[in-house]
């Protein structure tokens, strides 16, 4: 009796990009946006598997696509952030752009970016819709200095100086362990950012991960006998969390697992930031992307492999077989190394719309066990894993 494979099942492919896929953003069960290293953006209609809209949004690789109300926000290595209504440009601003770092929205009206002056630091912008306005409210804040300052205050608190600081550290990271920070001048450049609930997580080149909370004080209204004064206090970032388990490997992937942070690096280790933290090791290195589905991890590796429920799928490059290589020196080991040619994974995301909880499938199970084809069909549009590759192809997979 053969068992059904739990590996992601290919449902369709989307082919139009000529350059490597750099970002994929699902906005509904029917539409996704994709971007590539040339700066092209495509809005896909998944019902017909064709582009509905396409435009040259930037002159270089697009690092981030965000949905902000009715707008689409794009962030590129050409050092600009642009706001679009469909393919019509509504707003543009200069911004620092690094090789990997994305930008994130916070509470839908703040934008967190790498700092313009220093790639290791952070800028925070406040967004307004009507008309679109962007104002910088926090400039060039050093997270490394914020961590050091908070640690100093925590030591003062332990000494009885009355400083009230509450920061969650990884269980392997003790407040009194000075070796964790001694001799280090910085965390390096920002590599990845992710917002979970009210916490902004930032992964650094050093392997450090920091969690921040953006405090937005309420405006204070002061009334006098002849006048009324509105006092606006500026937002500030407060340290909530730090983890050093991935040091010294750069953080290249962050994900949300039911409210818990999951992180991966250039190494083989994935950290689940529960209490206490859990570490999962894989046989492949380069944790390019982490997605979560029904309490399980979907791991995309640099070399193109995708692992889910212990099974791996890959897209091998076409190979010419049976020919005689007159230049071959008979070294089978080198020959095998040269044939290790999978299409490189460059972007991966999971869409969960409509039947994302699987409730419809659960109802059917009370009557009879659904056929595998029915399960795949039910989930192919609502729950889909989208994998973008260096050859410009986007593959749609169903997860069972």
Swiss-Prot record:
WD repeats lie at residues 6-54, 57-94, 240-272, 273-312. Keywords: Chromatin regulator, Nucleus, Repeat, WD repeat. Its main location: nucleus. The keyword rRNA-binding does not apply. Belongs to the WD repeat ASA1 family. Component of the ASTRA chromatin remodeling machinery complex. This is ASTRA-associated protein 1. The gene is ASA1.
